Amino acid sequence: MIRSFGTLRYSPALRAGVHTRRDGGTTRWWLIVDCDPELGRYLRHLYTIAKRRTRTLQAPLWGPHISVIRGEEPHDVRAWGEHDGAAIEFDYDPNARETDGYVWYPVECAAMLDLRERLGLAREPSPALHLTIGNARYTR
């Protein structure tokens, strides 16, 4: 596992102040961890090299990030926004995984799971915590 850090961000906007997605959904009840953009660039570069430069990745809309809460309305909304903007450490497995063109790395972080519990959500999210670095679905 490799240690890194990011910043907690509640209800992340898709564009300047916009929370509505193209499919009509919302990012209102989302909690992500913004990760270092350079980490994302580096990991996408390693992916491209591993694929012998035959595949590239498009960066995620939010940049490299960990989705801690994905649209689950918390049971205890009073705790929503707790520690917004705070730094948080996490460990990630350096072996990339790919699902439906999305490339990600498994993450371990007890503090993120503690936040889920404080909000009245199941400790373990589904899918499990992971660092998203890009997708190969829409690249040329």
Task: Show where each model-derived region lies.
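Histidine-dependent nucleotide/RNA phosphoesterase domain, centered on the 2H-phosphoesterase fold
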Residues: 1-140
